[in-house]
């Protein structure tokens, strides 16, 4: 009898999962989303042209559940992405664009090395911008339940940008999560921080000047301080338990964990002068 119950339960979840991710169900989502988007001020023309062509992308769900930041320790993550080859490419990018990059670095007070490093990490200096249709990616993630509210908001923002001719809808290919351009900006980041640095009337985040200026503006707006180091060398009184290693910076900033970690760090006074871990 127990086996029968288990079979029924498993079958139910299989059927439920198949239904959630069926093409028919995604089509229903598109109809409902268009109604919602109209109320947000998106034009019917844009919705019919853009959303009607969107498709459900199963791979996007897989990528969302299996991100490198979730399962790779810090050393492995950095060693895979900070290679001598990338340093050579980065130096070449700077050599070919140093006037623009120096100007932007000075204007926004953001270290040029930081900007180049971010570009290298995000897109290998523009050599891999992503091949996913970000409209379909955002639609898939909006349809999915895990972070539907966030991605619905991002999709609405992107449609507003298209409606206002700020971004070109014919060139929207990027990451599985909907990020775009040399520095992988999400739609809300484009809306809030992107800069038309070359004054051509368009924001082109695949072009050097606009993308570097936008990234610099983003960092400046978030309060980046060139006088503070990116990393802090610490000395330990004793080993930190494994459960506290490789947690995100956001989690470390919680008051509870700061107080707990403090007893393990010998040179905590050194960190205090940078106001780190107490933000």
Per-region residue spans from a language model:
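Catalytic glycan-binding domains that act on GlcNAc-containing polysaccharides
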Residues: 41-279
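Generic hydrophobic-segment detector
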Residues: 7, 12, 27, 110, ...
């Amino acid at each position: 009898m127990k086996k029968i119950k288990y079979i029924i339960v498993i079958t139910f979840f299989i059927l439920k999962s198949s239904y959630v991710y069926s093409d028919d169900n995604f089509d229903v989502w598109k109809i409902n989303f268009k109604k919602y988007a109209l109320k947000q001020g998106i034009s019917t023309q844009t919705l019919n042209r853009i959303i009607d062509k969107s498709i459900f992308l199963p791979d996007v769900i897989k990528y969302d559940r299996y991100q490198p930041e979730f399962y790779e320790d810090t050393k492995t993550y950095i060693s895979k992405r900070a290679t001598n080859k990338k340093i050579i490419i980065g130096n070449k990018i700077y050599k070919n664009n140093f006037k623009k990059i120096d100007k932007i670095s000075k204007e926004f007070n953001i270290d040029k090395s930081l900007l180049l490093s971010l570009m290298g990490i995000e897109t290998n200096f523009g050599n891999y911008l992503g091949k996913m249709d970000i409209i379909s990616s955002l639609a898939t993630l909006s349809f999915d339940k895990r972070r539907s509210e966030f991605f619905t908001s991002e999709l609405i923002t992107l449609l507003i940008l298209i409606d206002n001719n700020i971004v070109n809808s014919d060139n929207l290919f990027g990451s599985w999560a909907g990020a775009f351009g040399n520095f992988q900006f999400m739609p809300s980041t484009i809306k809030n921080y992107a800069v038309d640095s070359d004054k051509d009337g368009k924001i082109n985040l695949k072009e050097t000047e606009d993308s570097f200026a936008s990234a610099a503006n983003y960092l400046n707006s978030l309060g980046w301080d060139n006088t503070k180091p990116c990393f802090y060398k610490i000395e330990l009184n004793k080993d930190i338990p494994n459960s506290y290693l490789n947690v995100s910076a956001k989690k470390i900033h919680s008051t509870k964990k700061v107080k707990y970690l403090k007893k393990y760090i010998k040179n905590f006074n050194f960190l205090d002068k940078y106001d780190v871990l107490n933000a």
